[in-house]
Curated annotation (Swiss-Prot):
The record marks 111 as: Important for acyl-CoA specificity. One of its GO terms (biological process) is L-methionine biosynthetic process from homoserine via O-succinyl-L-homoserine and cystathionine. Transfers a succinyl group from succinyl-CoA to L-homoserine, forming succinyl-L-homoserine. Transmembrane segments: none annotated. GO terms for cellular component: cytoplasm. PANTHER family: HOMOSERINE O-SUCCINYLTRANSFERASE. The gene is metAS. It is an enzyme of class 2 (transferase). It catalyses: L-homoserine + succinyl-CoA = O-succinyl-L-homoserine + CoA. Substrate binds at residues 163, 192, 249. This is Homoserine O-succinyltransferase. Keywords: Acyltransferase, Amino-acid biosynthesis, Cytoplasm, Methionine biosynthesis, Transferase. Its EC number is 2.3.1.46. One of its GO terms (molecular function) is homoserine O-succinyltransferase activity.
Length: 313
């Protein structure tokens, strides 16, 4: 949330240059606040588990956020009761004529599937195209980040030879960028993907701000100049045991998975894993809600227009 200070206080310019949200007394006197409208497009198989993880992160903010859950299509789910989907999830047809402050598109276990072979690929393209004219800021997670880069920049699908699984250190590159507000210089975050996000490749083929990278995992966090599209290639929403569940699942399927890196104490799967990324996940989502959504979105969503947004250089 912003701090309110006298209009001409000398500290205001210093703080604004550090991308700290400073509100003058004159602006505060006319400020209008309403709940933020955020749409969560849940592509993960275990939808109840995933929605809980994201709601946990979205709740850690003084801003009131109204969440609506969106399903990609009406195909039956193998891992979520149909009653749950019918009760709590909306079809795109029911929301497409409305505007939203934020959209989150989750990951999906489709790392080795070509985009054109994804059953709902056309539906996803339609939703991403719709978001450009109806959503202030979209947050793409893991596989969705790769899909978003394909649709927005026509980047080819790049796949690693071995699955990336574990908790990795990342370095920040633009310390005064709003999304990095309060970040440590180095932080931990989990990854579970085949997708390859090479920093040099993204820098050469896009105009994205590359905000955080890992020597092993590549680009972790990037955003368009106007902050309307934010790409997170890892899984900051994961619970302590999510990577463990995936590891055990892959073992059971005979895939001979590698032990997730920097996850189990002493790299022993018999030991209880430690969630070393929890504070990072909460901070990332709080920053996205504050700087990319709340400070950018119009008070009256009916007046939403792409023309309201400029690309900050």
């Amino acid at each position: 949330m912003p701090i309110r200070i006298p209009d001409q206080l000398p500290a205001s310019d210093v703080l604004r240059n550090e991308n700290i949200f400073v509100m003058s007394e004159s602006r505060a006197s006319t400020q209008e606040i309403r709940p933020l409208k955020v749409l969560l497009l849940n592509l993960m198989p275990k939808k109840i588990e995933t929605e809980t993880q994201f709601l946990r992160l979205l709740s850690n903010s003084p801003l009131q956020v109204d969440i609506e859950l969106l399903r990609i299509d009406d195909r039956p789910s193998k891992n979520t009761p149909e009653e749950h989907l019918n009760t709590f999830y909306r079809q795109f047809e029911l929301v497409k004529n409305r505007n939203f402050d934020g959209l989150i598109i989750t990951g999906a276990p489709l790392g080795l599937v070509q985009f054109e072979d994804v059953a709902y690929w056309q539906h996803l393209q339609n939703i991403m195209a719709w978001a450009k004219a109806h959503v202030t800021s979209t947050l793409y997670i893991c596989w969705a980040a790769q899909a978003g880069l394909k649709l927005l920049y026509n980047l080819p699908k790049r796949t690693r030879e071995e699955k990336l699984s574990g908790v990795y250190y990342h370095d920040i590159h633009k310390p005064f960028h709003p999304l990095l507000r309060g970040f440590d210089d180095r932080f931990l975050a989990p990854h579970s993907r085949y997708a390859d996000f090479d920093a040099e490749f993204l820098a050469e083929h896009t105009d994205l701000d590359i905000l955080a990278t890992s020597d092993v995992a590549g680009v972790y966090l990037a955003a368009t100049k106007d902050k309307r599209n934010v790409f997170v290639t890892g899984h900051p929403e994961y619970d302590a045991y999510t990577l463990h569940g995936e590891y055990v699942r892959d073992l059971g399927e005979g895939l001979n998975p590698a032990i997730p890196v920097n996850y189990y104490p002493n790299d022993n799967p018999d030991n209880k894993p430690c969630a070393s990324w929890r504070s990072h996940g909460h901070l990332l989502f709080a920053n996205w809600l504050n700087y990319c959504v709340y400070q950018q979105t119009p008070y009256d969503l009916e007046k939403f227009s792409e023309a309201n947004f400029t690309k900050d250089e």
